[in-house]
UniProtKB/Swiss-Prot annotation:
GO terms for biological process, alphabetical: DNA replication; DNA-templated transcription; regulation of DNA replication; viral DNA genome replication
Protein task: Plays a role in the initiation of viral DNA replication. A dimer of E2 interacts with a dimer of E1 in order to improve specificity of E1 DNA binding activity. Once the complex recognizes and binds DNA at specific sites, the E2 dimer is removed from DNA. E2 also regulates viral transcription through binding to the E2RE response element (5'-ACCNNNNNNGGT-3') present in multiple copies in the regulatory regions of the viral genome. Activates or represses transcription depending on E2RE's position with regards to proximal promoter elements including the TATA-box.
Name of the protein: Regulatory protein E2
SUPFAM superfamilies, per the entry: E2 regulatory, transactivation domain (SSF51332), Viral DNA-binding domain (SSF54957)
């Protein structure tokens, strides 16, 4: 095609796009048409650039990389909207703003969203040190088998999340990351829809989950984590991975809550102070609160530590005897790609294995290959599970290792 033909084609496509703007249709088919026209327009621009043209009429052409990106973006939007049009939500109102690429990429990414509202976080409980976040009344997402679901955006002390169809919580924003920068004390309060959520008041007694919210009658939030039984060397079966599903403030603010006293405790492991506290009978008192574990004791525990009633130092020592792991099962290529992407999350785990598989075991191809991720403690693993998205189509289970 010569420059005149390309110019005519570009003008015709732009005219159709402008007509869609003027119509402002709320029908999903109109949005599919809009992105199809954008795809054709940027493919035309790409071809014209490849032919050496810098303008089509009075229209300057974008760089090749820009046209390629925009065309691929339009293809992606078209595919997602076509899939959505075959779901039960196709009859809802879908405007240009609801189906924009920018909105698709805002947290939570790769989901459609409607009716945003503001969540204000007061760092240090100071109204003058406030940061606004956007949450959504409705979030439309695809599950592992590409079925569409609609859910509500929710808020707790830790951040913004939505609950998936299987009951799992998917956090798409954690306040702790900004608190590292803007907060002096490591505390904040959350204000939204005439509700206030604050941290539990520190006391010597165990804090209830109800302390997370100041609204009377508000139910506490829990992070639903997958659990599966693991068998120990002695033949005992424990339910590893069953935990309270809301990460406590001490878990989320792990790096900030190390006080001077705790630092002194950590630095004096050679002669630790024996600090007696009330521990449930099923947990060995000496190993939970006593001296640091020896090399032979590492990995020797087969029971979970209590969630409260022991110091931070005692918890670290106790968990050293039972390093937690995450076993992921799936296709080899998916696991290898995911392992490569994990390089930016190295601070959230201790080490990981290469992709491997068991020999002489007949298992489905979808779960034949394995990958192990090892953590320093269960708190680190909980944070990892909230921040890192597991590869699609893979399954996982929790467990422990006696040694590495």
């Amino acid at each position: 095609m010569n420059q005149a033909d390309l110019t005519e084609r570009s003008d015709a496509l732009q005219e159709q796009i402008l007509n869609l703007y003027e119509q402002d249709s709320k029908d999903i088919q109109a949005q599919i048409q809009y992105w199809d026209l954008n795809r054709k327009l940027y493919v035309t621009y790409y071809y014209a650039r490849k032919e050496g043209y810098s303008h089509l009429g009075l229209q300057p052409l974008p760089a090749l990389q820009v046209s390629e990106y925009k065309a691929k973006q339009a293809i992606e939007m078209g595919l997602l909207l076509t899939s959505l049009s075959k779901s039960q939500y196709a009859s809802e109102l879908w405007g240009l703003t609801d189906t924009s690429a920018e909105l698709l990429l805002t947290p939570p990414r790769n989901t459609f969203k409607k009716k945003g509202y503001t969540v204000n976080v007061w760092f240090d409980n100071n109204e003058n040190n406030t940061f606004p976040y956007t949450n959504w009344e409705y979030i439309y997402y695809q599950d592992d088998i590409e079925q569409w679901h609609r859910t509500r955006g929710e808020v707790d002390y830790n951040g913004l999340y939505f609950t998936e169809n299987n009951g799992n919580r998917a956090y798409f924003l954690l306040f702790d990351s900004d608190a590292q920068t803007y907060s002096q004390t490591g505390t904040w309060t959350v204000h939204y829809k005439n509700q206030i959520i604050s941290a539990p008041v520190t006391s010597s007694s165990k804090q209830s989950s109800d302390d997370y919210t100041s609204k009377a009658g508000q139910q506490p939030h829990f992070f639903a984590s997958s659990s599966s039984p693991t068998t120990t060397d002695g033949g005992q079966t424990s339910q590893e991975g069953v935990s309270s599903s809301t990460t406590s403030p001490s878990a989320v603010r792990l790096r900030r809550r190390r006080s001077n006293e705790q630092q002194r405790e950590l630095s004096s492991r050679e002669s630790p102070r024996t600090k007696r506290r009330r521990v449930p009978d099923e947990v060995d008192r000496q190993s939970a609160v006593g001296s640091a574990p020896t090399a032979e004791e590492v990995g020797s525990r087969h029971r979970s530590l209590p969630r409260s009633g022991i110091s931070r130092l005692a918890r670290l020592q106790g968990e050293a005897r039972d390093p937690p792991i995450l076993l992921i099962k799936g296709l080899a290529n998916s696991l290898k790609c995911w392992r490569y992407r994990l390089k930016k999350y190295t601070r959230y785990f201790k080490c990981m294995s290469t992709v491997f598989r068991w020999v002489d075991i007949d298992v489905p191809e979808s779960s034949r290959h394995k990958l192990l991720v090892v953590f320093n403690d269960t708190t680190q693993r909980d944070v990892f599970m909230k921040l890192v998205t597991l590869p699609r189509g893979c399954t996982y289970t929790f467990g422990t290792l006696n040694s590495l």
